[in-house]
Amino acid sequence: MKTGVKKLKVHVKKNDMVTVISGNDKGKSGKVLRVYPVKGRVIVEGVNIRKRHMRPTQSSPQGQIIEREFPVHASNVKKG
């Protein structure tokens, strides 16, 4: 880890059930899929869905648009 980078104490862990308390997805709930303690963010299942444009590859020659969860700040979620 880089020097000078401070880990934030995150009050939730992976597989915890949380509810979003602020932002566009306020009121939604889901399971924590991943925690980023250095950034103080968490990825919650079904929350903060964004579309990603994937470039063409050999397996999908036309490319595709996929929807996936993006991180939300840990202060915007609560357990329960």
Swiss-Prot record:
Gene Ontology molecular function: rRNA binding; structural constituent of ribosome
SMART domains reported in the protein's UniProt record: KOW
Recorded superkingdom: Bacteria
Coiled coil: none
One Pfam family per UniProt: KOW
A GO biological process held by the record: translation
UniProt keyword annotations, A-Z: Ribonucleoprotein, Ribosomal protein, RNA-binding, rRNA-binding
Family note: Belongs to the universal ribosomal protein uL24 family.
UniProt cross-references to InterPro entries, sorted A to Z: KOW, Rib_uL2_dom2, Ribosomal_uL24, Ribosomal_uL24_CS, Ribosomal_uL24_KOW, Translation_prot_SH3-like_sf
Subunit structure: Part of the 50S ribosomal subunit.
Chain's role: One of two assembly initiator proteins, it binds directly to the 5'-end of the 23S rRNA, where it nucleates assembly of the 50S subunit.
Protein name per Swiss-Prot or TrEMBL: Large ribosomal subunit protein uL24
One GO cellular component, as annotated: ribosome
